[in-house]
């Protein structure tokens, strides 16, 4: 803002002078437009509508068009345009769907001229015809474009884009009857204003909404478009089909694009979010901007070159409530700070490294490029004296190939094809993916899936029969035992009745011992015990006991008020039948009279013989509750995902993100998730894993990723007889006048799935061919071939 460079430009006898300057507005600006003499600029927004004079040292407010006591939605502007033939005529697009024209020559304070209320939703764009003084075009969120004759009260024609909303409309500077429109679904349409029934041409320009477009002021047929896919594309519309001739990759969604006057290959862009700067690009050098303006502190909403024949002054409005004039000489040049070296990995692990030839020559002590074969590829071309660049440095590209044994990516492909990310319970997903990783030799990944299963999956209820069977047979198909130890390591008194009979001086109560959730197993037909509320976070635990030497426990971490747990009866198999201690059952019968034990519990508390092969004692309850919150492991899992992403295994990060869903998604910011998703999808598409890529896009909850499947798809059809491309006008070939893809059964055109015989090439609708071959094996076309549907 403090730069004081001055410029004086001669324009048809007059001169534009000024400096880099700004002024504070009363409210954020949504759009700006410049008068044809470049002396005034209009600023419009939801709460501002003013005209400023552009003087040599500052902006001076000339007129406030928001008049009246009551605020009106007609003054809430989404766009504004100043007529380039009549300096008194303006038009605004209101957020309530009203198009308003303003006549600055009216003597009253209220300059409002006409209101057009035909749109049903917000009007995004208004545009005057460049040579016809009374023609105004508008595009709205309702999907319609309307052409108004300012001498009439209603629109003269309506254009339907067959889409959700229109984002931009622009009249062609060179073609009198042509205008372009951009849409939310990524399409660009070209219309003839004389034919409102259908567009002249339509093509998909971007993956996602196309927010802006601009016709080149000199080259007829050059159309620049910008969209949410962070790209600016230049199209040649003079050919039979729209041809992309330039593409510029930006770092954020493109909100505005304007060609720079007197510079054929330069255009200016600003972003819709994230990035507040304004960039001027040379489309021949799409990776580094030629100039950058950094004055704004919030999103830039409108840009306009001050004069159609002056490339030095750029005006901009922003949400930071400032209006700026940028002097091109004061712009920063990122190319001066750019790194001239490049590094990139190939699909199969090859590493490419590009460096300036001068650096290579200096390090190797040799002269510049003289045909040295140590650097296999050199980029060098003859410099055009007319180009604005001061010079082009020749670069040397070295390619390093990986070893055949160490660069294989088969594990990535196998993992992507075999992973299951949805459609099953979480435990099954983790088990399946762990098995896949283990079979591919990725033990750390397999262990990670296993730990995720243990952390987030409840162990569930396991019947005593199944539990004993698993323990006795050594099966690993069930859930792992939470607490287990060998009975052989315990004292001999554990199985006697003295373990149940405690003295009155014992501090542990009988109710804690004979709780309703712990009963002795009588046989395999016993009912399951009630479920435990202990979380699955407990991997190991201690068992309650009377002797410290048998049941070691760290008492420092046990709260005195926490509930105590005892051995569940179903996991208490005895080693042998007790026949010589008759006092045991009597003692239990006495315990049945206790108010702490019900009769049913006493009846089932008999000591039945159990198979001696069952030598493990399992505890389904933790000894004490550690009061861990549900999201105790969230930070750990988040760090684990970032670890895998930083190691380059974005496949694991995305897979876990999809499988766990909301359990972990809330702990990772949206931008990081989007970066992981897009990186993984790019890898999948490089390996031609289209189905897996589509599944990842469908399962993603990121808006920027899920919208990748919402872009329109263009299907090109050739005539089956003369091979001529079919036009978009129908299913009849323009050359041979035959219908394409005729069904051999119903003799109608197949506009959907077409199935054909590989032997005779006849076919038709899928359902028709299937039904035909159910009753006959001969071709329905009558060629005599025996067709078979498999």
From Swiss-Prot:
Record Gene3D superfamilies: YVTN repeat-like/Quinoprotein amine dehydrogenase
**Spans annotated as Disordered:** 516-537, 579-607
Residues the entry annotates as binding Zn(2+) 4: 762, 779, 783
PTM notes: Phosphorylation at Ser-155 by AMPK in response to glucose deprivation inactivates WDR24 by promoting interaction with 14-3-3 proteins, such as YWHAG, preventing assembly of the GATOR2 complex.
PROSITE patterns, alphabetically?
Answer: WD_REPEATS_1, WD_REPEATS_2, WD_REPEATS_REGION
Chain intervals annotated as zinc finger (C4-type): 718-740
GO annotation, biological process:
autophagy; cellular response to amino acid starvation; cellular response to nutrient levels; positive regulation of TORC1 signaling; protein K6-linked ubiquitination; protein localization to plasma membrane; regulation of autophagy
Q: Which top EC class is given?
A: transferase
Q: How is its activity regulated?
A: The GATOR2 complex is negatively regulated by the upstream amino acid sensors CASTOR1 and SESN2, which sequester the GATOR2 complex in absence of amino acids. In the presence of abundant amino acids, GATOR2 is released from CASTOR1 and SESN2 and activated.
Ranges occupied by WD repeats: 72-112, 118-158, 161-201, 205-245, 249-291, 295-338
Query: What positions does the entry give for Zn(2+) 1 binding?
Result: 719, 722, 733, 736
| InterPro entries reported in the protein's UniProt record | WD40/YVTN_repeat-like_dom_sf, WD40_repeat_CS, WD40_repeat_dom_sf, WD40_rpt, WDR24
Zn-finger (RING-type) intervals are 741-790
Where does it live in the cell? Lysosome membrane
Q: Does the keyword Metal-binding apply?
A: yes
Q: Where Phosphothreonine occurs along the chain?
A: 581
Q: In which pathway does it act?
A: Protein modification; protein ubiquitination
Write out the residues that bind Zn(2+) 2: 743, 746, 765, 768
Q: Please write the reaction equations for the catalytic activity of this protein.
A: S-ubiquitinyl-[E2 ubiquitin-conjugating enzyme]-L-cysteine + [acceptor protein]-L-lysine = [E2 ubiquitin-conjugating enzyme]-L-cysteine + N(6)-ubiquitinyl-[acceptor protein]-L-lysine
Q: Which positions does the record annotate as the modified residue Phosphoserine?
A: 155, 470, 496, 594, 598
Q: Which UniProt keywords apply?
A: Autophagy, Lysosome, Membrane, Metal-binding, Phosphoprotein, Repeat, Transferase, Ubl conjugation, Ubl conjugation pathway, WD repeat, Zinc, Zinc-finger
Q: Where does Zn(2+) 3 bind?
A: 757, 760, 785, 787
> What family is this protein classified in?
Belongs to the WD repeat WDR24 family.
Physiological role? Catalytic component of the GATOR2 complex, a multiprotein complex that acts as an activator of the amino acid-sensing branch of the mTORC1 signaling pathway. The GATOR2 complex indirectly activates mTORC1 through the inhibition of the GATOR1 subcomplex. GATOR2 probably acts as an E3 ubiquitin-protein ligase toward GATOR1. In the presence of abundant amino acids, the GATOR2 complex mediates ubiquitination of the NPRL2 core component of the GATOR1 complex, leading to GATOR1 inactivation. In the absence of amino acids, GATOR2 is inhibited, activating the GATOR1 complex.
Protein name as annotated: GATOR2 complex protein WDR24
